[in-house]
Amino acid sequence: IIIIGSPLRKYYGGAFSYSVDYSTSYIKRMKLLLNMFKENELKSIIYRSGWNFGININDHFSIYKNLHISKREDVSHAFQLIANSKISIINYNSTTWLQLAYINFPFLLFLDKKYDLTTDLNRDILELMEKNKILFYDSKKLYHHLIGLDNKILKWWQTEDIQKTIKEIKYIFNNKFDTKEFVKSF
């Protein structure tokens, strides 16, 4: 399992970044999720931190001794980590989940309703993703779904409902960016 983490800021970074109070909320939300995992389960998880904009995730996640942390500053792209995982959890609204949908790679999206807004442009697809248990806003529901998948991730991912959802994501979003470089990593 790889968790793709959000860049966290101590300062406001402009129109395309989350507000400063997002970082505190994000860390709290992630700890709620990570606290549910048993120590032996954490051994199979890599947390991929976003850029360090004044907040070092190691300062907050060092309590999880068995959690592997990969820093964005050390390796700029997480593609190889994703390719070596069975499933990715993307915990902020980035293009990663769109790229994974494009190549049909299993992922779960873990968003925060306060910061990741639903609009007329994304409401229908987000509701469909939530209905089909690809999108979660609650850490407990996400954890139980993930544990329930056990080693049947691909079986779940290939179900008709999931594949219809992925096709819908591709139809709505994936013609918006060039994924050729991303696909080469797999």
Region spans (language model):
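Acidic donor-binding loop of glycosyltransferase active sites
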Residues: 83-91
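Conserved catalytic-core segment of nucleotide-activated headgroup transferases in glycan assembly
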Residues: 1-59
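Catalytic binding pocket for nucleotide-activated donors in carbohydrate/polymer assembly enzymes
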Residues: 62-65, 92-173
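Short, well-ordered alpha-helical microsegments
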Residues: 54-57, 78, 96-98
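Hydrophobic transmembrane helix bundles of membrane-integrated enzymes that assemble
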Residues: 2, 32, 37-38, 89-90, ...
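C-terminal alpha-helical cap of glycosyltransferases
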Residues: 171-186
